[in-house]
């Protein structure tokens, strides 16, 4: 290769690298800020490595119902909710695989309402787009995304190129402002109170797509195998909810899941309001989810339940322990002030 050809190749490579960097920067700017309602990967990756005791997975039933800071206040156990809106088990598997690159929890707690979802739900784009870039994200797109969304997920300017009129200083600042851990730990605060006066829990119909259910079970098998390989315990819950499936459907789900992973602990809590101490006239956000007050009670109950099962808090650095104490106090103050205002 003569000097001219070599120079041309070097210029071409430099151009490609520069173009890739510019496209990456543009993608960061154009992609909307996302720090609630699941898929909070930036904050998760800022947690100190191997500092999380409990990893919560699932859909909005997970990130609305569990507040890890409140659980910490009640039990000393640290946790994070790495969930996503209407997240299917196939995506949950890839979330778990990615999450375990920086954390080694004692137990994974998966909220299992997603086993009743369709093959694809409404928030695939958000669930996958905010995953860290890498081979697992690419494999997740091919495995769990609708075919017509894959192009935009691989090249997200396809989705967001027309956002330039909506850009804010916060969008631009993402390029130079590093992400940080926060007090939410994947939890999303919702405070609406669902009116249940004179009513009782109503029936929820799961998807009738048997192919979707089989795919969800295949994903669960991979989740269970990954937990087994890593020496992590696995609990599947159906969280307290006013929209409940029939006992027969829950029985079938338990049989199917424990048939795949006999070591997994299945906890049907859909109608366990009294056991947990929930007030259905105050603690529900809507027909499906708990509100902030309900999440506080359920998170305290979850922490104590996990202690009873033999899990114990791991040792934390002085700095991280102080951060958890401060975060817990923030949420406890918010709860206490809200209760005082309501009384």
Regions found by a protein language model. Name each.
Residues 57, 61-144:
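Membrane-embedded segments
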């Amino acid at each position: 290769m003569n000097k001219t050809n070599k120079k041309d190749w070097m210029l071409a490579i430099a151009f490609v690298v520069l173009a890739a960097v510019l496209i990456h920067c543009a993608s960061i700017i154009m992609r909307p800020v996302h720090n609630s309602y699941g898929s909070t990967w930036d904050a998760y990756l800022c947690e100190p490595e191997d500092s999380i005791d409990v990893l919560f997975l699932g859909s909005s039933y997970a990130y609305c119902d569990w507040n890890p800071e409140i659980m910490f206040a009640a039990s000393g156990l640290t946790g994070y909710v790495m969930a996503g809106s209407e997240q299917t088990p196939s995506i949950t598997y890839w979330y778990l695989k990615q999450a375990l690159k920086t954390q080694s929890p004692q137990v994974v707690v998966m909220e299992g309402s997603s086993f009743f979802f369709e093959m694809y739900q409404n928030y695939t784009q958000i669930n996958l787009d905010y995953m860290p870039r890498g081979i697992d994200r690419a494999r997740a797109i091919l495995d769990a995304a609708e075919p017509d969304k894959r192009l935009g997920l691989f090249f997200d300017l396809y989705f967001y190129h027309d956002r330039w009129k909506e850009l804010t200083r916060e969008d631009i600042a993402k390029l130079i402002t590093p992400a940080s851990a926060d007090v939410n730990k994947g939890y999303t605060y919702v405070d609406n109170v669902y009116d249940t006066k004179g009513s009782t829990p109503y029936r929820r119909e799961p998807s009738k797509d048997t192919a979707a259910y089989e795919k969800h079970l295949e994903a669960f098998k991979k989740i269970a195998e990954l937990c087994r390989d890593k020496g992590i315990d696995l609990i599947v819950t159906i969280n307290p909810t006013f929209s409940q499936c029939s006992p027969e459907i829950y029985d079938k789900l338990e049989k199917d899941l424990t048939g795949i992973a006999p070591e997994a602990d299945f906890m049907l809590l859909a109608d366990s309001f009294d056991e947990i101490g929930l007030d259905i006239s105050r603690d529900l956000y809507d027909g499906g989810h708990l509100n902030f007050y309900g999440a506080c009670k359920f998170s305290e109950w979850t922490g104590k339940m996990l202690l009873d099962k033999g899990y114990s808090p791991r040792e934390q650095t002085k700095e991280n322990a102080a951060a958890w104490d401060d975060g817990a106090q923030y949420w406890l103050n918010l709860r206490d002030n809200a209760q005082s205002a309501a009384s």
